[in-house]
Amino acid sequence: MITFDLETKSYADLTKVGAWAYSKDPTTQIICACYQIGDAPIQEWWPGKNADDSIPEDLRDALASGMLIEAHNISFERSMWMNVLTPRYGWPEVL
């Protein structure tokens, strides 16, 4: 199991516009992503602070193996993944 969490910022008010509109707002940015694959240590990904901003190799491999993702607010994380991580950073699409 992959546990996944995002920290974000935006001029859009999440409580007023909802997760999908928030994730589509051009001012919405990802501050960092934290993830844990199984019992491995928690990893952090910070846009602009990596050799490149593509998906970390261990996370990509875990997804490719069919490992499931859990998140405390999965609709938010999924919206952000689909509308920010994939188009802006080239992360693979998730269902």
Annotate each predicted stretch with a short phrase.
Residues 2-4, 8, 13-17, 28-95:
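Conserved DEDDh/DEDDy metal-dependent 3′-5′ exonuclease domain
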Residues 21-26:
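Short consensus segments that form the blades of beta-propeller domains
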